[in-house]
Design a protein with these regions (language model features):
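Conserved S/T- and glycine-rich ATP-binding loop of Class I adenylate-forming
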Residues: 62, 79, 110, 177, ...
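Short hydrophobic alpha-helices that are characteristic scaffold elements of the AMP-binding
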Residues: 77-82, 103-104
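Conserved ATP-dependent adenylate/AMP-binding module captured primarily in the ANL superfamily
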Residues: 87, 93-127
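Short acidic/polar active-site loop segments enriched in Thr and Asp
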Residues: 57, 108, 136
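Conserved AMP-binding/adenylate-forming core of the ANL superfamily
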Residues: 3-11, 24-69, 73-77, 94-99, ...
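ANL superfamily adenylate-forming
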Residues: 32, 116-174
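Conserved pre-ATP/AMP-binding loop-to-beta segment of ANL
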Residues: 24-26, 139-140, 161-182, 189, ...
């Protein structure tokens, strides 16, 4: 594990290490386009800057409901860089399941994909967001331009359009929670499994 001095670390350091040592190497391919480690790191920095400037703070839990698209990776590492906890969950969940996870985890915010006509992800998330007691901010990765934004519901570009390409990653300890993965809940309510930065 690549860590900061003094025993402090952050899982996002793995991305930063790759961006520093192999900046032009491919981090991922999407729709025939290569995205380098340096590009992923810059986008994660922009999102981390956007999160903190929106009032999200170290230790806050940020839910992420998104399919396998580049924005998932950018947001995932941006959340970690900001010292927040990533809370990824399945795009097929219905609003009552999403609401349970948001409130059970005490998520402060959620980033979600708008979806498709067949799978309108953001519509389900919006219903849960409006009923949630803990979640106060929602950002939508637009895909169809059909989704109506509203009070505390913004376009993802608000986060990703930060002018700053740099970010001082928040240092965490090995005991700090980095990710919470929820079980499927097949035998009862889903349970959150916490993973640390270690």
């Amino acid at each position: 594990m690549y860590s900061f001095g003094g025993g402090m670390l952050n899982l996002a350091a793995t991305l930063e290490y790759s961006a520093k040592t192999n900046p032009s190497d491919p981090a991922l391919y999407f729709s025939g386009k290569m995205i380098s480690y340096a590009e992923v790191n810059i986008m994660a920095n922009k999102i981390a800057n956007g999160l903190l400037s929106s009032g999200i703070k170290r230790g806050d839990r940020v839910a992420l409901c998104c399919p396998n698209i580049p924005q998932f990776i950018f947001a995932y590492f941006g959340i970690l860089k900001a010292g927040c906890v990533v809370l990824p969950f399945n795009v097929l969940l219905k609003n009552n399941e999403i609401e349970f996870i948001l409130d059970n985890s005490q998520a402060s915010a959620i980033i979600c994909f708008e979806g498709t006509e067949e799978l309108p992800i953001a519509n389900e998330v919006k219903k849960a967001f409006k009923k949630s007691n803990s979640c106060k901010k929602m950002w939508v990765i637009k895909s169809l331009d059909n989704f109506v934004l509203g009070n505390n519901i913004c376009d993802f570009s608000v986060l990703s359009n930060s002018e700053a390409n740099d970010f001082n990653t928040v240092q965490c300890s090995s005991e700090d929670t980095a990710i919470i993965l929820y079980t499927s809940g097949t035998t009862g309510k889903p349970k959150g499994a916490e993973l640390t930065h270690a």
